[in-house]
Structure formats: structure tokens, C-alpha cells
Amino acid sequence: MLSSQTSSIFTVSRLNQTVRLLLEQEMGQVWISGEISNFTQPASGHWYFTLKDDTAQVRCAMFRNSNRRVTFRPQHGQQVLVRANITLYEPRGDYQVIAESMQPAGEGLLQQKYEQLKAKLQAEGLFDQQHKQPLPSPAHCVGVITSKTGAALHDILHVLKRRDPSLPVIIYPTAVQGDDAPGQIVRAIELANARGECDVLIVGRGGGSLEDLWSFNDERVARAIFASRIPVVSAVGHETDVTIADFVADLRAPTPSAAAEIVSRNQQELLRQIQSAQQRLGMAMDYYLANRSRRFTQIFHRLQQQHPQLRLARQQTALERLRQRMGFALEARIKQATQRQQRVSQRLSQQNPQPRIHRAQSRIQQLEYRLTENIRSRLSEQRERFGNAVTHLEAVSPLATLARGYTVSTTTDGKVLKKIKQVNAGDIMTTRLEDGWLESEVKSVTPGT
């Protein structure tokens, strides 16, 4: 019989391990309410204590990285609410609780309800970003749902008056604390939606304890905010206070004053933006005008470079350069002849026979005279040819022709008119005179006889 049950026999270690795994996996994380006793804190910083009620008790441990977040010092006999994991200390087989968080019993129960409602609404999708409505920009009317005697209303109105004095504000007074507060807040939200006077709502109150803010952790308020067709900004308590309303609202503001900042326009900032825009517009206009001025100057210079007078000036410059080159050529010829004469004289002087010298001198004088006359004749001839070339160039210049009373006519596409077959009656032609242009219409065309 013993051998048939061998597979069901546990060692002590295996038994404790199995029980620990069952406790951790099946129980998970739980909330435990009880009274603290035997509280100790050794040098390690961990807390060890017992939680008990009238009929039972359980050993608990809370490690340093968890207990440092507890905002109060636990006392013997104090009622607390602990969020913990159930486990077993295997070496001794001791069943114990490992605490993760601790709160005084009153706030602890509220916190437990808060966590349960938060998980429920989150599972339903009320916190999803896809349901968030965008705030109007700018807002044309702001609705405020809060106590008419609270500091929150004073803070909101003060900020709105400072930032945007012309912004209309409608107050929906309601209780924000007490048993009647959730119902009044819901009715105020529904009334604002029914009247449709505002395009954004601020729902909130000033700071307080968890009990003071509990109206904004009410499920009815959360669902009313979610159902609102008007975007809702939650502004409950201080920045560290987070309520269910904050998760459901379209936007959470850390304080009522911050909510007023969010929904209003800063008129001074708006004025600065307008002035900045005007300055940028002025700079853009200055740049545009300067750019167009540069473009005009470029076109003007290009037209000047294509003017007929400028072309004539370039031709005159080229003619002057040609004249200078001809002068330089003549001077070079004279210099070469002089040098040749000097060389001949030198050779003759070296031979020394007097008769030959006299004859050579006579011959040289004749050659010199003839050379001089020849050079003068050639120079005169070149000057005459140069003068004729200048006269010819001036004679064939279009401006000279126009000065003699002639005109040049062109068609509208710029072609010079040479024959009557290039135009027909009714065509427009342009005629160039010495001092300007004429535009005329062809009345008739008569062939020459």
C-alpha cells in the first residue's frame, strides 16, 4: 500500500514550495483591514508587524522600498488598510503577508473604492484618448461648475479677468462637498449642455482631503462628464490631487487657476503676436520692393547696353584703335629706313676711297631725298585712304542716312520693308526717323510704274 502512494509523498521543502506557489498564484494581491500590533523596525529599515482582528491574526512584513512611500508612522493599535501579497516563508513554513502599501482605515476604504471604480471605468473605455474632445481655440464662452462661495471660483474669475476681460463667463453654482454634491454637479453639467451657452466647461473645486474631494470620485459625476457634448476641463484640488473626474475629463488642469489659463486667451500675448506679424509683413514688403528695384536696375542696364548710340560709340573706338595702329606702322617703316641708311653709311665709311665716297654720298643724298619723298607720299596716301574710310563709314551709318531725310519702315515683327508685297492694306508698320519713331496703318498699296 505504501509503494502505491509513493508518488504522492512530499518532502518538507517541496510541500512548502508548493503551498507558497499556490498562495501567490491563487490569492494574488489582496486588501486586508486590521489592527497593528507588535510593530518593529530593525536597522535594515524594513517593518515587521502583526495584523489582527477580534478572532485572528497574521504576520506581516513591509520592506523598505515600499514603506518609504507611507505618509504616516504606524502606531500600535492603529486600524489600517493594507494592500499586500500572500506568501509562505519556506525555511520555517510560516504563512505571512508582504505589504505593498498602507493607509489609515478610513482613507484606506475610500482609496479601495477609488481603485475599484477607476478599474471599472477604465475597462469600459471612459479614459481612452479617442473619446477626448478638443478644446475650442479660442473659447467664446466659458462655463464654470463649482461652489459660488469657494476660493476656486474667485481664482478662476481673477485669471479670466486678467487674461481676457471680454470673455463671457457663465457660473453654474453647485455644492462640491457632501452627500448632495454629486447629484448637483451632474445636474449642472446636464443644464449647461441643455442650454448650449458655453463651448467649454471648467468643473472643479479647491484642495482638501480625500473625503473633501470625494464628490469628484463619484461614478455619476464621471459618467456625466463623459457624456457631456461640451468639452470639460477638470480642476479639482491641487496638482497632487488626482480624481476620477480628471481621468474622464477631456483635459485635466492641476489647479482651478491653471484651468482658467488653459481656456482663455492672453490678450497681451495676442497683441505681441499681431505686432510680430506686422513686423514680419513689413520686412517681407521691404525685401520684395528691394528685389523688384534690383530687377528693374538690371533690365535698365541691359537696355542701355543695347542702345544704338552705344553700338556707334564702340565702332568709333574700334576705328580710333585702327588709326593708332596705322600711325604706329608708318613710324616703324620710317625707323627701319633710317636704320638701314645708317648701316649703309657705316659700310661706306669703312671702304674710304674718296671718289667712291663722293659718289656714294651723292647717291645717298639722292636716295634719302627719294626715300623721304616716297615716305611722305605713302603717308599722305595712307591718310587719304583713312579719311575716305571714315567718310565711308559715316556715310553708311543708319543715323547718317536718317539725317539726310531718309526713313526706315518695319513690320510689326521687326522686318525691314523693302517691297510693297511685304504689307497689305490695314497692316501696322513702324517708321524710324532721325529723332524718333512713327506707327502708321497702311491704307492702300500701289505698285510702282
Curated annotation (Swiss-Prot):
It is an enzyme of class 3 (hydrolase). It is found in: Cytoplasm. GO terms for biological process: DNA catabolic process. GO terms for molecular function: exodeoxyribonuclease VII activity; nucleic acid binding. It catalyses: Exonucleolytic cleavage in either 5'- to 3'- or 3'- to 5'-direction to yield nucleoside 5'-phosphates. Keywords: Cytoplasm, Exonuclease, Hydrolase, Nuclease. Its main location: cytoplasm. One of its GO terms (cellular component) is cytoplasm. The keyword Cytoplasm applies. InterPro entries: Exonuc_VII_L (IPR003753), Exonuc_VII_lsu_C (IPR020579), OB-fold_nuc-bd_dom (IPR025824). Its EC number is 3.1.11.6. Belongs to the XseA family. HAMAP family: Exonuc_7_L. Heterooligomer composed of large and small subunits. Bidirectionally degrades single-stranded DNA into large acid-insoluble oligonucleotides, which are then degraded further into small acid-soluble oligonucleotides. This is Exodeoxyribonuclease 7 large subunit. It comes from Salmonella newport (strain SL254).
